[in-house]
Amino acid sequence: MFLRVLNAVILTVISLPVVAADYQDANLSPEERVRDLLPRMTLEEKVGQMAQYVGIEHVAKSEKNMSIEELRKSDARGFYPNLHSSQMPEVIKTGKVGSFLHVVTAEEANMLQRYAQDSRLGIPLLIGIDAIHGNALVRGATVYPAPMSMASTWNLDLVRRANEETAIEMRATGSHWSFTPNIDIARDPRWGRVGETFGEDSYLVGEMGVATIDGLQQGDFTGATKVIANAKHWVAGGDPINGINLSPMDISIRTLREDFFPPFKRAIDAGVFTFMAAHNEINGVPAHSN
């Protein structure tokens, strides 16, 4: 009799519906889910959400060409000192990373997300990629003309449509975040990233940037065919000393406000969801710490 009662209790418990936490309920608003999730997170998990790592496959390929000493000390090729690619799954499962880049296959994206599901809170990963003129880092993707060539068309609708298609192809391979548009103003032809920009005219750059943002995000970026856009690089990387990428910028406040700021103001007005800080110094102050 006791066993029958015990079995009945066990079966009743097993058959009860599993109630997910509010942050796991897709029917709630993002704000409601975040309010529920944040108090559950440790400080380490919160910091982890701000950490972006290079994809495991990318790191593993580079490791084959590096010495033990380089592996131990150097992060110049997308490495992290004393962290081997074989250790990355555990880093994800312990909630110490929130985002990845250089993930170029759906298979790897799915694998990374499975590791994230095994973490304490099961927070999905945000995966970003440089889809500047199509999702061109992915084999088989549609590759469009570079931004400089797109700008020469003066065809905003064409640029928007190209980025709508890019968003679809990104989502098909597991990416959610495109590191574009590059709305730097190209002022020195020696600079190696001129072709990645929409040119030297502040107005045209701003309009092309908005068309790119609209195509990628399509208003609200939520949905299976939309991604997050990223306006970069804030600010003034397009006229570096001697034309060398990442070198300092010495520039007047007037030139910043008249030429370099307007495209970013247009991006904000268009609802861009993210900015990327510039990698250069501006009048002696690193952009990342300005």
Protein language model features and the residues they cover:
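Residue-level detector of intrinsically disordered, flexible termini
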Residues: N7, V19-A20
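N-terminal signal peptide c-region/cleavage motif recognized by signal peptidases
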Residues: S15-L16
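Sec-dependent signal peptide recognition
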Residues: F2-L11
